[in-house]
Amino acid sequence: MAAVDDLQFEEFGNAATSLTANPDATTVNIEDPGETPKHQSGSPRGSGREEDDELLGNDDSDKTELLAGQKKSSPFWTFEYYQTFFDVDTYQVFDRIKGSLLPIPGKNFVRLYIRSNPDLYGPFWICATLVFAIAISGNLSNFLIHLGEKTYRYVPEFRKVSIAATTIYAYAWLVPLALWGFLMWRNSKVMNIVSYSFLEIVCVYGYSLFIYIPTAILWIIPQKAVRWILVMIALGISGSVLAMTFWPAVREDNRRVALATIVTIVLLHMLLSVGCLAYFFDAPEMDHLPTTTATPNQTVAAAKSS
């Protein structure tokens, strides 16, 4: 049985003094939790992976995505299932709109703004606002072009609202659907680093159309040069958002396939903007010419001269 003296605790005031007295004693170093160990075992990260993280903006997206995956999903036939697609606040919507207007080179729009919570609230109302902006601005533009003509009578063209709605919503849903199917097909052939869901692609396309709302309002200016400059600015901003977002999803594919995909995305976006400008704003110069009626005296004079 151990002696009583062996069970007594001894208080060590100075570790250095104790080590001097017992040089062969075993020491244990407990590091402070806030300090980073100087030496860590493990292989360093490759430069390629660091490039992917920098391009995709992977700061805290893994944690957010993990927490988002823990949410319980309701059946698709219930109202709660679709309610989750509109579960965003004003700050998130404004932040995503700002991201679509100020694209950051080398950063991914999905990873920075959408990945944690893709929504349909922003894309739905952006498309609705764009529809009315194009239709109303197109009517006002036609009115200003013919303003001052005695024979011109303004008639509102309400059919432009339905045409604009069909065009905008078809583009905002059918093009993402086709792109999502294409990416899924290519992902089965080539293991890509990045994959997007259908809702994420719809979200990207919806927010990328926001720049066309102020552009459509400024298209009222009856100057073709100004209109085309506005088209190029809007196309450059929104097209760069789409290109930088979807390039990481196709860059591991065949080089020609990747470039053809990005070029197709930009060309379809250009076709939408140019088509809207040409149809809704570039009206014919004169749809009707002033008609003149001949008086009886003029008819008699013409008969005598012949």
Curated annotation (Swiss-Prot):
Glycans are attached at N297. Residues 50-59 have a biased composition (Acidic residues). Residues 1-119, 184-200, 249-256 are cytoplasmic. Signal peptide: none annotated. It is found in: Golgi apparatus, cis-Golgi network membrane; Golgi apparatus, trans-Golgi network membrane; Late endosome membrane. It is a multi-pass membrane protein. It comes from the Eukaryota. Its main location: Golgi. Pfam families: Yip1 (PF04893). Residues 15-29 have a biased composition (Polar residues). The chain crosses the membrane at residues 120-140, 163-183, 201-221, 228-248, 257-277. The keyword Cell wall biogenesis/degradation does not apply. One of its GO terms (biological process) is vesicle-mediated transport. Residues 141-162, 222-227, 278-306 are lumenal. The keyword Transferase does not apply. GO terms for cellular component: Golgi medial cisterna; Golgi trans cisterna; late endosome membrane; trans-Golgi network. Belongs to the YIP1 family. Interacts with YIPF6; this interaction may stabilize YIPF1. May also form a ternary complex with YIPF2 and YIPF6. This is Protein YIPF1. The gene is YIPF1.
